[in-house]
């Protein structure tokens, strides 16, 4: 499937066990398998930008935001179902019906009055944040498990208005969250704050990953990324050609794709990069999906 065109401009790939969901700039969705074979036709369940999404077991959960029409939804779609096209933007513009419309093929859907960010799969649940409201943990059926206040960090309080949580992940039977400005917190299973701190970084955090044997990989919004063995360590900064958009642990080494380059960090700590003429959006196996919707082999 290398060199094939998926048919739209992608913005993200969500990874499941044996299935991947590609989302597009206009709300398109496409399911593919590990061999990059499409499992169904492209569909647009809701006519809005998908701002956050993840996979939990056999469901894909997404957040759709249409800011001009002030419409927002969070919904779950069963990965084993056939998905279909939903309402159009003209349907949403009809004020009388707009607020009753939901993404098609959903197993549950909610109308939102605030924008969730950092939608993340954490063990058998979903965590997300809402700006200036709190952090939440829900199950796969949208039942609330707990909610808590967003941690505050005195070191970065001057920019608190512009800060937001970027992601959550499972870490040693607890969960870790990070904010754009470098704040991190460890939360226990009941939503209680265990530890917090601030990472000193040269750029804004856009995402992060953790692997027991590799430590932490911190994605930044400029021409750097960072690694740490422990959250209490000083970050090690690496310079690259542009932002990293997706990173994977492949055979015990960090591999990534991003703005105009692919890269890897070897077991010995050697940084290797190869330039590309386009932008890498996501990785499946040894393949990169570019911003123009083409599958290519990773270049490192």
Label each PLM-derived region with a short phrase.
Residues 192-274:
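Intrinsically disordered, low-complexity segments enriched in Gly and acidic/Ser/Thr residues
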Residues 35, 80-83, 101, 139-149, ...:
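Per-blade loop-tip surfaces of WD-repeat and WD-like beta-propellers in eukaryotic adaptors/scaffolds
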Residues 26-32, 68-84, 133-138, 181-187, ...:
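Structural motif
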Residues 1-5, 37-43, 103-111, 144-159, ...:
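A short beta-strand motif characteristic of beta-propeller blades
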Residues 8-11, 22, 26-33, 38-57, ...:
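WD40 beta-propeller repeat fold
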Residues 11-24, 30, 53, 57-68, ...:
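Short beta-strand elements that form the blades of beta-propeller/WD-repeat-like
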Residues 5-17, 44-59, 106-107, 111-121, ...:
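Repeated scaffold domains used in trafficking and secretory/extracellular systems
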Residues 86-116:
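Asp-box/WD-like beta-propeller blade repeats and closely related beta-sheet repeat scaffolds
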């Amino acid at each position: 499937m290398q060199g094939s065109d998926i048919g739209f401009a992608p913005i993200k790939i969500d990874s499941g066990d044996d299935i991947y969901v590609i989302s597009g700039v206009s709300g398109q969705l496409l399911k593919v398998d590990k061999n990059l074979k499409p499992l169904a036709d492209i569909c647009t369940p809701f006519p809005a930008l998908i701002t956050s999404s993840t996979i939990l077991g056999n469901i894909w959960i997404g957040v759709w935001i249409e800011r001009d029409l002030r419409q927002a939804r969070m919904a779950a779609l069963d990965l084993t179902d056939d998905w279909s096209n939903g309402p159009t933007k003209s349907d949403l513009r009809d004020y009388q019906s707009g607020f009753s419309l939901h993404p098609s093929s959903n197993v549950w859907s909610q109308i939102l009055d605030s924008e969730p960010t950092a939608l993340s799969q954490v063990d058998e649940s979903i965590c997300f944040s809402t700006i200036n409201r709190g952090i939440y943990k829900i199950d796969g059926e949208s039942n609330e498990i707990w909610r808590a206040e967003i941690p505050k960090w005195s070191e970065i309080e001057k920019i608190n208005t512009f800060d937001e949580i970027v992601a959550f992940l499972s870490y040693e039977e607890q969960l870790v969250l990070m904010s754009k400005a470098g704040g991190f917190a460890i939360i226990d299973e009941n939503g209680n704050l265990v530890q917090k701190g601030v990472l000193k970084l040269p750029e804004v955090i856009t995402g992060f990953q953790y692997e027991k044997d590799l430590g932490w990989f911190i994605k930044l919004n400029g021409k750097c990324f960072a690694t740490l063995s422990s959250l209490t360590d000083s970050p090690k900064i690496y310079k690259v050609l542009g932002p990293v958009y997706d990173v994977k642990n492949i055979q015990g080494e960090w591999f990534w794709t991003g703005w105009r380059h692919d890269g890897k960090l070897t077991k010995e700590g050697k940084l290797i990069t190869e330039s590309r003429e386009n932008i890498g959006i996501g990785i499946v196996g040894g393949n990169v999906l570019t911003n123009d919707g083409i599958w290519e082999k990773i270049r490192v």
